[in-house]
């Protein structure tokens, strides 16, 4: 078998739609129709989390939503902790014991629905919230299971908005709102945090943002306007801060609006929907996701969520102690990959056993859409040199293969699919 001293290969883009790690659809955690989505969405009420003061229902919650199974499958969570979800019946979303200690919120029956809006400025409420949030974070852990945390806690649906024009106790002032946000920042150091609006805190702390009116042009344009120019919130004309380039460092999430039909968003006005997604640089949508029965729209939306990584070129050169490898990696998606997960090259034998692993000096969070990075490493040893055996026409006879993978630290498995036309095996993409 002959050996050459150099080898170059290029790879075409795979333009198909597919789920991928940390991006795409985030259906409800207890749905039976999640398909192959890599994310799940958990809306957790305080009432469910802490039924008695200081007594947390973590074991029941973990079992109810199958957390152990999700972790094993490599599925990650989007979580929103909420205190007020408008419904069809009068109800409480905070625990009875907490209501008994406060009672200074507002029972309501509005066009949003029925429920109870707490007084979030209440000192007892704030102290109890601090405790439950840290307990929740400790329960969920720091293994990366929770990828995204949407703030959460304040307002109807946790969206930091109260229908105070209907006489409800209004949102607290910025100082108190910032206390809530600071608790989230401290409690969830390994997750990406997202706020509903570009508050000053979000801009200063480089947080992400989410849009729960995705697909609705007027509301999304207003949301994008806040991001571009800042604006009013309540009585403060400067509470919303311009942060037009935030998506380069922090993610965009949200869900489809309930004000439009799937037929409208995924068929009739699909181009409009896709345009709104693209200019928003979204990474995930949930829990209201596209319906799979609208296959064209479902896939078109999925394809526009998040990063799309491709090795565009590989160059191998024989060197004294092995093979030098130079790769050009491009991001052809709408957003960066926000986690610094290890990107590895692997030399494998024909049975798929890993003979050599080398981490690439590739910074995924810095790889912006439309950009590429060129990285070089040395694959040491005779096994790597055998990658240059044969010739392009005789590659099938080469005793070694070169693969690339991006490892999810939660599972220690390769989890990211590259958007390129190449064979895949065990979560890795085959380069040679």
Question: Where on the chain are the PLM-derived regions?
Answer:
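An active-site-proximal structural segment forming one wall of the substrate-binding cleft
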Residues: 65-71, 100-150, 176-183
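Substrate-binding cleft of secreted/luminal carbohydrate-active enzymes
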Residues: 198-202, 209-312
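Extracellular/luminal regions of secreted and cell-surface proteins that mediate adhesion/ECM remodeling
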Residues: 303-432
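Short catalytic/ligand-binding loop motif for oxyanion handling, primarily in non-cytosolic enzymes
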Residues: 48-50, 85-94, 155-161, 201-205, ...
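Short, flexible/disordered intra-domain loops and linkers
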Residues: 52-54, 160-172
